A protein has these predicted regions:
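Histidine-rich, glycine-flanked metal-binding segment
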Residues: 2-21, 28-77
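Alpha-helix-loop-beta-strand connector modules within alpha/beta enzyme cores
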Residues: 124-141, 189-200, 352
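Active-site mouth loops of central-metabolism enzymes
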Residues: 81-94, 115, 143-156, 225-229
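His/Asp/Glu-enriched, well-ordered alpha-helical/loop segment
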Residues: 221-249, 317-318, 322-323, 329-404
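Metal-associated gating/positioning segment near the N- to mid-region
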Residues: 70-134
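Divalent metal-coordination and catalytic microenvironments
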Residues: 26, 41, 46, 71, ...
């Protein structure tokens, strides 16, 4: 595979250490303060040295590389808290190399990888493998989630302390809910003792049953079994009650219904250490987009009614929803070109998360700074990471993008190994032009 085809560059450690880099004449998005100003950013030795209106060519070191952004937006690199990377065990779907290529092209500088791989990330050796592979083959930062239970079987608690020491950023069983409430209570207690964050996929699988899309009139018209929104809410409500009992830190991986939002709102009002995310798909698409059984829009959780989508957008705008994720889940052609009931769940999203989110900005539903905050500073705060902010001393993970540049999503040009995008041939606005990690350019559009 010819790397030049992807217009992606490996960072040179020498250039990071010795050549300052400045992005000038930019529309700076400061997500911590929900503020936009014109100015620039200076990165030295991989860290933000300064930013603001005073960053202009006349005030920079003589040997600095200067990039004139021509009024484009500059923001912290995006942090995606929920992505499936096939390595190890499903490299035919995605590898760290291909996923981080896609991420760099989409403005994502930190990927948080799900643990439901083969083998699962339930031993320190697997965490170490992922971190080494990311160093050797990755273009952006990759942080592994480790399992809550051994083998992801929902029974025996994993060695959370050892996994944390090995480098796991948080703990989850991936797209599997822990059914047993007693086990979940013990998991939360154990995680609390290590101040570890629990990220849980809330779904009552018994209630969801054989459902393949959102329960309702549209599912009935298509003749497909539905999944009641209560399947999410019941499990989430149980989890929040257990958080209240244990005092653990809890993050709902994906909330997709107004019922769930009510539960989250009450938990936050009660002072519990609870946060939540939703996917860019659930913010920008609804069940009607499935149309004539489009399997690329068969997702888990399923796309919901338009009223639910609007409730999610309102919750994002208010700050009730903390983070927006790609829910990247590559599936190959053989598992998607099947009848809807037989097709696998999931869609790719690393490369389109930002541009899809900008649809909400262009429609007037969300301010740009609020959208960027949900993809940068809030995930960083939840995971206790130094990146995701415009701040002196923060890592020089930055992106430059034109929020108004139009393009059509061409699956053949996407960098992911699989092409199951829900935005196939969709018209978008918002192109990433440059991505930096630790002060080094890892992607630059031609």
């Amino acid at each position: 595979m010819d790397e030049s085809e992807f217009r992606v560059k490996r960072s040179s450690p020498t250039s990071i250490a010795h050549q300052p880099l400045a992005l000038v004449n930019a529309r700076l998005i400061d997500p911590a303060h929900l503020r936009e100003t014109m100015g620039g950013v200076l990165v030295v030795d991989g860290l933000i040295r300064d930013f603001g209106a005073a960053i202009m060519p006349a005030n920079l070191p003589a040997h600095a590389r200067i990039i004139d952004c021509g009024g484009d937006c500059v923001a912290p690199g995006l942090i995606d808290m929920w992505a499936f990377i096939g390595e190890p065990g499903a490299e035919h779907r995605e590898t760290i190399a291909t996923a981080t290529l896609a991420a760099a092209a989409g403005g994502i500088t930190t990927i948080v990888a799900r643990p439901d791989t083969n083998p699962p990330v339930d031993e320190a050796a697997v965490v170490d493998f992922l971190l080494r592979r990311a160093r050797d083959t990755g273009r952006v930062r990759l942080l592994p989630l480790a399992a809550l239970t051994a083998g992801l079987d929902g029974a025996e608690i994993a060695e959370i302390g050892l996994l944390q020491l090995a480098g796991a950023v948080a703990f989850s069983d991936g797209a599997r809910a822990i059914r047993n409430a007693r086990v979940m209570r013990r998991v939360l207690q154990y995680a609390r003792d290590f101040d570890a964050l629990v990220i849980h996929y809330a779904e009552d699988r018994d209630l969801a049953g054989e459902g393949v899309m959102n329960e309702g009139e549209f599912a009935s018209r298509l003749g497909l079994a539905g999944i009641a929104r209560e399947a999410e809410a019941i499990m989430l409500d149980r989890d929040i009650r257990l958080v209240n009992l244990t005092g653990a830190r809890y993050h709902a991986a994906l909330v997709t219904t107004a019922l769930s939002l009510d539960i989250i709102a009450k938990a936050k009002a009660d002072g519990l250490a609870v946060t939540c995310a939703t996917s860019i798909n659930h913010l920008t698409l609804n069940e009607n987009d499935i149309g004539d059984y489009r399997t690329f829009l068969k997702l888990a959780p399923p796309l919901r009614h338009e009223d639910e989508r609007r409730a999610l957008v309102a919750a994002l705008e208010s700050g009730l929803i903390d983070a927006v994720v790609s829910d990247h889940n590559p599936q190959d052609v053989e598992t998607k070109r099947l009848p809807f009931t037989e097709a696998e769940d999931g869609a790719i999203g690393l490369e389109t998360m930002l541009s899809a989110g900008l649809r909400l900005v262009h429609s007037g539903e969300i301010p740009l700074a609020r959208l960027i905050a949900a993809m940068t500073i809030r995930p960083a705060e939840i995971l206790d990471l130094p990146q995701g902010r415009l701040k002196i001393g923060a890592p020089g993970d930055l992106i430059r993008f034109d929020p108004d540049e139009p393009f059509v999503v061409d699956p053949a040009k996407l960098h992911s190994r699989c092409k199951n995008t829900p935005f196939d041939e969709a018209r978008m606005e918002g192109k990433v032009k440059l991505t930096m990690v630790a002060g080094g350019i890892v992607y630059e559009a031609e």
